[in-house]
Structure formats: structure tokens, C-alpha cells
Amino acid sequence: ETGTEELTAQNIVLATGARARNLPGLEADGDRVWSYRHALVPPHMPKKLLVIGSGAIGIEFASFYNTLGAETTVVEVMDRVLPVEDAEISAFAKKQFVKQGMVIMEKATVKQLDRAKDKVTAHIESGGKVETREFDTVISAVGIVGNTEGLGLEALGVTIDRTHVVTDEYCRTGVEGLYAIGDIAGAPWLAHKASHEGVMVADLIAGKHAHPVKPESIAGCTYCHPQ
């Protein structure tokens, strides 16, 4: 079917999710350069893998494919892997990753990817020098961005902070009757946080008591080895 339909409601909940962030020159193509979505349904098993970014998404896929036998290199622009964790946790995790055969490059940046039919040449800057390394697969794990475009939110006066909708602890956007839940509402990008937000907003709309979202109370986990 085609055409436009206009709907009216007292309350509207935005739950459009998010997508992988693409950086210029590092865009995923689904062939040799993957986003997290491609890595979930891989077209081939990597033999020599480069993972750009060492947040939860990057480390989880690095750990997974390394366990399956891929020679895995992780490049992180910050001074330690898993930079949102405590420093001692990052240090312990890095030690274990190296023992497992991973190559960890911290304070390093992938400046350019040269793509060929069966390989990708990465230009990696580290310590003021640029070196080239070859891989058959690259996973770009440099964050996610909320799907805020094409919804007319700016015209309504909804505040957008870079890549997500700004909400209060009850997921209210500041526009009467308009809520935002899940990844479009920003970090932490966790399924159980989104589920709680959905239940909470449903309770609010139904006139029931609702427990607000408290970021400091949201448990998080990076599914790697060690976990």
C-alpha cells in the first residue's frame, strides 16, 4: 500500500531505536567492512580481523571472533580498552585479552581503509607514526546514533542532543503527551533499560504509579571472556 495516513492520539511513544555510527572513510559496506549488524549475520568467517573501537560492542565481537579462531586486532582511540569501566577492570581485561592472542592498540586511530576484493588495508596512527596492516575483515564499532530523522521532532520543539532525544527520568520529551524510550533516548543502550522504560511509560499513560529511570541503578555487562 502507498499513501499517507494521519493518526491522532493523546499520547505517542517514540521507540525508533538506533543504528551503527559511520565515520567518514570507515563506512560499513557489509562485505569487508562490517557494522555490528553485519557481524551478527556474517557473510564469511574472518581469518584476520580488525575491530575499531573497544566499547562493549567492539570487545564483545572481538572476544567472540577471537575465540572462533580469527587473528584479532583491536584499535582504541582512548588510553585503555573498555574506557567506560574502572581503570583496574580495563587493565585486567586487557591482560586476559592479550593472553588469548588478541593484539590491543591503545591511543591509536584508524586514519584510512583501502578496500580490495579480498582484503582491507588499514592505515593506523599510533605514537605519532602511521603504519599499514592488512586484514580480510573490519568491524567498525564506533558507537550508535538514534533514529531521530524524518520525524519532525525539531518542529515540535523536541530537544535533540547530538544523536538522541532528551528526556527526563519519566521519558517525557517536554512536549505534552510525547515520550521517547529505548535507544532513541540515549545511553545506556541496553535492552533491559528499554524494557523498563516501556513498562514505566505504559503505567504513566494508564494513570498508575511508575518507577522512574535512575541511570546509576541500571546494571550493565560486557559479554566477553572474561565477562
What are these regions (language model features)?
Residues 1, 121-123, 165-167:
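Generic recognition of long tandem-repeat/solenoid scaffolds
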Residues 19-21, 58, 81, 145-148:
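Glycine-rich nucleotide phosphate-binding loop and flanking beta-alpha elements
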Residues 2-11, 128-137, 174:
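Core beta-strand elements of the Rossmann-like FAD/NAD(P) dinucleotide-binding domain
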